[in-house]
């Protein structure tokens, strides 16, 4: 399956990722207007593009999914599947390299509950097992230690530290890059290590 063939519905039994729908407008508005949520995030994230949250949802399919720019999914608890508690994102898809990046942001009421780690694991599983990518990356501001802990627990090793990137702010920001390769993911799942030939 290719990444943009269809919207996935992913669950681990506790968390689910699904398509964002018009009924999510209120929760999405609460998320996107919380400055603390966006403290360590890019200034040009899609949910911030239009003043009207309903327009964001209306245009999301056409401007993100159909153009294959990014895939944004609602993060929900399985016991509350209609309540958006955050956004999961797959972006920077490079099909010729079988590579993509992931991101996530949660409403503050859902912080500290292991949800971000579950999201990272669900995206990882989907991208390696279903989409058959070779590489999945995540970029976070160096100061964002909470997200660093999430990614490490989700199995993403830190590969590059203190890299300057343009995140739409007045000056470039220091970013840490977490990169997971398919062979490493397989080794973690099976306990079998694949060594490169010399």
Where are these regions (language model features)?
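Conserved GNAT-fold acetyl-CoA-binding loop/helix
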Residues: 38-59
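Acyl-donor (CoA/ACP) binding surface of acyl/acetyltransferases
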Residues: 1-39, 72-198
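Short, conserved alpha-helical segments within structured domains
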Residues: 45-49, 71, 143
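A short helix-loop-beta-strand connector motif used in the catalytic cores of GNAT acetyltransferases and
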Residues: 58-74
């Amino acid at each position: 399956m290719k990444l943009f063939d269809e919207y996935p519905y992913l669950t681990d039994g506790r968390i689910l990722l699904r398509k964002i729908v018009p009924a999510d407008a209120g929760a999405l508005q609460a998320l996107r207007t919380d400055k603390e949520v966006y403290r360590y995030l890019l200034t040009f994230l899609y949910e911030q593009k239009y003043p009207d949250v309903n327009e964001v949802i209306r245009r999301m399919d056409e401007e993100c999914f159909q153009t294959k720019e990014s895939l944004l999914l609602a993060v929900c608890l399985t016991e509350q599947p209609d309540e958006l508690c955050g956004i999961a994102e797959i972006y920077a898809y490079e099909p010729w390299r079988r590579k993509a990046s992931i991101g996530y942001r949660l409403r503050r009421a859902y912080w500290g509950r292991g949800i971000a780690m579950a999201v990272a694991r669900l995206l990882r599983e989907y991208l390696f097992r279903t989409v058959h990518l070779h590489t999945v990356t995540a970029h976070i501001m160096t100061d964002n230690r909470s997200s660093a802990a999430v990614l490490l627990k989700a199995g993403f090793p830190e590969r590059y530290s203190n890299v300057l990137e343009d995140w739409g702010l007045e000056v470039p920001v220091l970013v840490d890059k977490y990169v997971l390769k398919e062979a490493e993911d397989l080794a973690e799942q099976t306990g079998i290590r694949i060594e490169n030939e010399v």
